[in-house]
Each structure stands twice: as structure tokens, then as C-alpha cells.
A protein has these predicted regions:
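Beta-rich carbohydrate-recognition modules and glycan-binding surfaces
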Residues: 1-187
């Protein structure tokens, strides 16, 4: 099921048959690090998420600072208002498919994560490293090896789909990539 945003990155209610509506957005560790020694998101800038035909592009560089965790882009799945959990089981959504392209795919990984109402920081994810078409199913994701108390993924309380560029203390990680042709995969 195609998920096509408008020119500001918003997917309108009723624009698809699986009830997904919300905005694309950027995020980074700058909030946690109070704007110092944090990831620099160079695009998009300002409010909204400017795009052409639903091609969501971002660029920047991560930080090597202690406490830095990276940056990324994401999509709200049920933006209310207020934002609510999205029940993937109601709409029989099992994951998402998308095209990854760009001049600089991070040399480490992009984590495609599904945050839930109870689990934002240690959300299950699948790591991807190559351009092309990718299908990431909920059943293929797992929490990171650093998670000491794993939680069970609750498909009835998904809040976001995130494309995170994790930072490294060894060297800054540059990125310049686009997500295009996003679709919800259904049973």
C-alpha cells in the first residue's frame, strides 16, 4: 500500500487504505547533548520535510562525542492529534518496503527501527547497508546486542518508523541518502 506524503512530508488521513497518517521528521542526539558536539543534520532544514514526489532525503554527519547516538529521519504512523499508537494488526501491516538511494549511504549501517509506545530507546530494528529496494518485516527485527533487558515487540502500539544513522566514537559518519517509494506491506 503506497504511503505518499505531500510537499511538506505529511501523509494525510484517508490517503491510504491502512490508516497511516503523520509527518516525516528529522531527529538527532542534539537534544540529549544540549546542542554541543552532536550530529549535524544539514538537510532538510526548517519546519516540514520538503520533498519531491515523496522522495525523503537527508544529509549530515554524526558526532564522536561521548553520549552521542546519531541522527535520522522518521515517519509518524498515527499522528492524531494527539499522536497515538498505530495498531498494525488491525490493518494487517507486517512491515514496510522502500527504495534506498543516495550519494553517501552510511559506511556503518542504517537502522530501520519500529518504536512502540513503551519502547523508544531500544526499539527493534534491522540494519541495512546497501542501496536498493528493501523490505523490512517486523518479524525480521531484533533489539540491539547492548540491550540488557529485552522487551517483546507489541505490534498494536507502533509509534514510528525510523531510519537511524548510529554514531561511532572512532570517526564521524557522514550520510546523504533518500527514502523513496515507501509502502506498507500487508498480509
Amino acid at each position: 500500500v503506497p504511503l505518499v506524503p505531500d510537499a511538506t512530508g505529511y501523509i494525510a488521513p484517508g490517503s491510504n487504505t491502512v490508516g497511516i497518517h503523520g509527518s516525516w521528521f528529522t531527529y538527532s542526539d542534539c537534544t540529549d547533548l544540549m546542542g554541543k558536539n552532536c550530529a549535524m543534520v544539514t538537510s532538510p532544514t526548517g519546519t516540514g520535510f520538503a520533498n519531491v514526489g515523496g522522495k525523503m532525503c537527508t544529509s549530515g554527519t554524526t558526532s564522536t562525542a561521548t553520549g552521542a547516538w546519531g541522527a535520522g529521519i522518521g515517519l509518524e504512523l498515527n499522528d492524531g492529534p494527539p499522536q497515538q499508537p498505530y495498531d498494525t494488526e488491525t490493518y494487517k501491516v507486517t512491515g514496510f518496503c522502500f527504495q534506498l538511494s543516495g550519494a553517501t549511504i552510511p559506511s556503518t549501517t542504517i537502522r530501520v527501527a519500529f518504536t512502540t509506545q513503551e519502547n523508544n530507546d531500544n526499539a527493534p530494528f534491522e540494519a541495512i547497508t546497501t542501496p536498493g529496494t528493501h523490505t523490512v518485516l517486523f518479524s525480521d527485527t531484533a533489539q540491539g546486542s547492548w540491550v540488557t533487558t529485552p522487551t517483546v515487540f507489541d505490534p498494536t502500539k507502533v509509534m514510528l518508523v525510523q531510519f537511524q544513522i548510529p554514531s561511532s566514537t572512532a570517526a564521524p559518519i557522514p550520510w546523504d541518502f533518500c527514502i523513496d517509494g515507501m509502502t506498507a506491506v500487508t498480509e
